[in-house]
């Protein structure tokens, strides 16, 4: 005799993607495959340049190499599964795979968030306390900050996964997205729990606000320090070291904010998926170009690497 409370039916999960139109699937496949390859190759090139070129063996580029690695993993969490689903003409994803994808995505999303804050702190010390820079931002501190970012990101993902595993889904779960995203899963439960929804929605926002606030504080001190420099050339030199990082910060947080605004304002089942493309795919793809085009040290290192290969 089977008790209704003793067993729990595992629902079927489906990723609806961007469009139900079958004629658009090939175009979407080619577009995302191209962006994924550019993302992986571009970030791998940045990592290779930093590892092989000794002038780039500094804290600033140590953090950049970590950011490039995280961006590769960040995109690899979502895009390959979407490409496989398009290729096989299947929208299905298992419950275990969905939870795993959501958890891993959360880890790398928060790592991006924390690493941008760490990089802002690095620029703050370099510009505001240049005489003590090598003493303060030493190898031990660099490794410690990266490890701490990993630990907090993993703990956050574990917390969210634990909550999602307790949620009840009624019937088949059709996710209007191209990956298992936390906010989408929280909206598809059939038994609402106010405390669970508060944690699922507020904790990521709180972590983002903390990191963004630390970035704002770092740049407030940086701007104050730059304004005190008397020479125009000195101001330009100091600020030029921050331009690439500022560009990435703007892309990351503006596109992330756009996802939440779009999903809240636009009442479309696929609006959140389309908006999140900038946040999850385009930004990691553009990061290597921003650093290679705007950063003289990286451009010179790239030239030396290419000359050595030819």
Swiss-Prot record:
The chain crosses the membrane at residues 26-46, 68-88, 101-121, 136-156, 203-223, 241-261, 273-293. SUPFAM superfamilies: Family A G protein-coupled receptor-like (SSF81321). CDD domains: 7tmA_OR7-like. Keywords: Cell membrane, Disulfide bond, G-protein coupled receptor, Glycoprotein, Membrane, Olfaction, Receptor, Sensory transduction, Transducer, Transmembrane, Transmembrane helix. Coiled coil: none annotated. It is a multi-pass membrane protein. Glycans are attached at residue 5. It is found in: Cell membrane. One of its GO terms (molecular function) is olfactory receptor activity. Residues 47-67, 122-135, 224-240, 294-310 are cytoplasmic. Residues 1-25, 89-100, 157-202, 262-272 are extracellular. One of its GO terms (biological process) is G protein-coupled receptor signaling pathway. One of its GO terms (cellular component) is plasma membrane. It comes from the Eukaryota. Disulfide bonds join 98-190. Pfam families: 7tm_4. The keyword Protein biosynthesis does not apply. PANTHER family: OLFACTORY RECEPTOR. Odorant receptor. Belongs to the G-protein coupled receptor 1 family. This is Olfactory receptor 7A42. It comes from Mus musculus.
